[in-house]
Regions:
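Active-site-adjacent scaffolding segments
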Residues: 1, 8, 12, 63-73, ...
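Extreme N-terminal tail/first-helix region
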Residues: 1-14, 165-184
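Long, hydrophobic N-terminal alpha-helical segment
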Residues: 19-20, 24-31, 36-41, 190, ...
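Short, contiguous alpha-helical
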Residues: 33-80, 123-170, 203-251, 280, ...
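Acidic/histidine-rich alpha-helical segments that form the ligand environment
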Residues: 79-125, 144, 182, 186-195, ...
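Conserved small-residue-rich
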Residues: 171-215
Length: 337
């Protein structure tokens, strides 16, 4: 008999997959060639990516018996999935839309098959911790809750249809570029956390007496406005009043959250993506003479500009960790106790 949490994860995946298939089926021929904000993939490329590698994925690793806490920890530190993703997309560029649609229809079959034969002997491995970044940790069991991936890319495709986007080539100083990879990795981890949140959890308090999970998302979405102010100050485009305002941290944060009251989760994620792109555009404008600038925090601490870029990514990871208790996996576990 399949494990109840695995059956729930598979049902969630099937529901998310039907949603993604519906979005793909609604595309016109010209929609497939539209670019997806804010990168350089087309909708066709995004569908090719959403298919995945057709493997059993995490469930296959569990069955293979290769997972140990040490293996997971070391792999999470060095493995960067983006190169593999780019390779898969490049290889599938020769496929027709019909080919990709068929592959997408079958894409999760192996994963589901292997997941449903997991049993109680696999419970210790499902409980292994998977470090995702500062203050952000999930479990091996969360790998089985893969519906987030289809939800995320369904929204990406919708965004491409709604926006006229053309890729922008951004280049960074080497000192900045050295931090960008980790910033992007933590952003992907944050999106995983966002699209894993249960629909009925958003309006619940993340902490007793504090913001709801949706308000926390509003803060995360708007927070890039803070580094943008600091970067514009370095570029000579922000005044003292603006830079002083962001140091009144609680007041500034609450004002940004209040401005987004009533926004849908999807609108907040759109805001999140747009704001991050604007931050990257500012980072691309930095020149060697700007590298000597220091960034001051409300605490009085100061960091170098390259270190501050790393801080932007760590903020994403920290808030992703805050969202984990609201995930579909945790909600199911809570209801099952």
């Amino acid at each position: 008999m399949s494990l109840p949490q695995v059956e729930a994860a598979v049902e969630d995946l099937r529901h998310a997959h039907r949603e993604l298939l519906g979005v793909v089926d609604s595309l016109s021929d010209s929609d497939w060639e539209r670019y997806v904000p804010y990168g350089d993939w087309t909708v066709k490329d995004k569908v090719a990516h959403a298919i995945g590698d057709m493997s059993p994925s995490g469930a296959g690793l569990i069955h293979a018996g290769v997972l140990t806490p040490e293996f997971i920890e070391s792999t999470s530190r060095v493995f960067d999935v983006r190169a593999r993703n780019a390779s898969i997309v490049e290889e599938r560029r020769r496929y027709t839309k019909e080919d990709l649609r068929q592959l997408l229809f079958e894409s999760h079959d192996a994963m589901i098959e292997y997941a449903l034969i997991l049993n109680e002997s696999n419970l210790p491995v499902l409980a292994y911790a998977v470090p995702m970044g500062p203050e952000y940790e999930i479990k091996v069991e969360d790998w089985l809750w893969h519906g987030y991936h289809d939800r995320q890319h369904a929204d990406d495709i919708r965004r491409a249809v709604e926006m006229d986007w053309q890729p922008e080539k951004l280049t960074f100083l080497p000192e900045i570029d050295a931090q960008i990879g980790l910033v992007q990795r933590y952003r992907e981890g944050l999106l995983r956390a966002i699209y894993s949140v249960a629909d009925d959890a958003w309006d619940e308090p993340a902490t007793p007496g504090g913001w709801t999970y949706k308000q926390d998302l509003a803060h995360i979405a708007s927070n890039d406005l803070r580094p943008q102010t600091r970067l514009r100050a370095i570029l000579g485009e922000a005044g003292d009043e603006e830079t002083a305002a962001i140091l009144r941290t609680d007041e500034w944060n609450q004002a940004r959250v209040d401005e987004r009251k009533g926004w849908s989760v999807r609108r907040l994620v759109d805001d999140l993506a747009a704001n991050r792109h604007q931050t990257l555009k500012l980072l691309a404008r930095l020149r060697p003479e700007h590298l000597s600038a220091t960034i001051s925090f409300a605490s009085g601490d100061q960091v170098s500009l390259p270190d501050y870029v790393g801080h932007i990514g760590r903020h994403d990871a920290m808030h992703a960790g805050h969202l984990v208790p609201a995930s579909r996996a945790r909600r199911f576990a809570m209801k099952s106790q």
